């Protein structure tokens, strides 16, 4: 089946998807509560959309399409409040975080949906290990060529989003030493990584995608687990590297950071993207996952080594006029605060050092999601 035409969207509109953890309040482990949560949400007036995820201890929510930070944040608060209310009725906690600190993958149950069952049959145990939680950010594009230009221009900024959103230091009761351990699980899938370097939509659709479809490996764009991928049915590019933050404020701020970056890149303020930019892509990605804001990057154009935290601060200065135009100054101030106060991964480690139990770490995550304003 040919790839559908790229839908025209209003430029720089944005939307957010969040994968959230469903927590038993008796032991703070994940709980297979999504069927019950989904049933209750279906009876409520939900201010967005909600869908199951691959295991029953997960829930995905999505916002509407927005142009500005205030609108996006307002809806995320409304979604959060609705989720908390429904969770309270079932005695289920809901929180962010890229991984649950001590859940065992083998205990997870695949949600009864045809696609999820097919994925489970194909990938085996990896499917249950995919009980991880990310934020996806969509940015509207006017056409497919523009989408591919932005997708490849953003490649050097992927480490920013990994480090700023990092919230997955613990896996199966161990400190992984990573700030974002979640992405290691994604990399296990054969169709993960980055998109092929193609800047023309017809070439991507008729050349690359049709060839991949003819191999029998893929049926749709959903089969690609790329860090950034085009979504022709939405008319967007979708960034998939972010851990789910602990608060909806951070989720909104990350979306607006991407929005401002796209506005900046569309003015051709940087050299055009090139295939060789990807020579350092996996190394820079690793640095952000492992060391977070303390990582060191190799600039893809100059091969200069730069501190990740300083690169974010330099970028924030460049984006200031674009944020002013987009009414997202407050969002970028939040990003600035992360560079000084630390990421959610740092917060979770601090709470573990304070309380010495991972159950307490989960409880702190629940408080962050519920009480943020």
From Swiss-Prot:
The UniProt record lists the keyword Membrane: no
Q: Output the GO biological process annotations, alphabetical, semicolon-separated.
A: modified amino acid biosynthetic process
- Swiss-Prot/TrEMBL catalytic activity: L-cysteine + L-glutamate + ATP = gamma-L-glutamyl-L-cysteine + ADP + phosphate + H(+)
Q: Print the keywords alphabetically.
A: ATP-binding, Ligase, Nucleotide-binding
Question: One GO molecular-function annotation for this sequence?
Answer: ATP binding
Which EC numbers does the record give? 6.3.2.2
Question: What is its EC class?
Answer: ligase
Q: Is Nucleotide-binding among the key words of this record?
A: yes
Entry superkingdom? Bacteria
SUPFAM superfamilies in the record: Glutamine synthetase/guanido kinase (SSF55931)
Family in the record: Belongs to the glutamate--cysteine ligase type 2 family. YbdK subfamily.
Q: Which PANTHER family match?
A: GLUTAMATE--CYSTEINE LIGASE 2-RELATED
* Task of the protein: ATP-dependent carboxylate-amine ligase which exhibits weak glutamate--cysteine ligase activity.
NCBIfam families assigned: gshA_cyan_rel (TIGR02050), PRK13516.1 (NF010040)
Name of the protein: Putative glutamate--cysteine ligase 2-1
Traced from the root, the source organism's taxonomic lineage reads:
Bacteria, Pseudomonadati, Pseudomonadota, Gammaproteobacteria, Legionellales
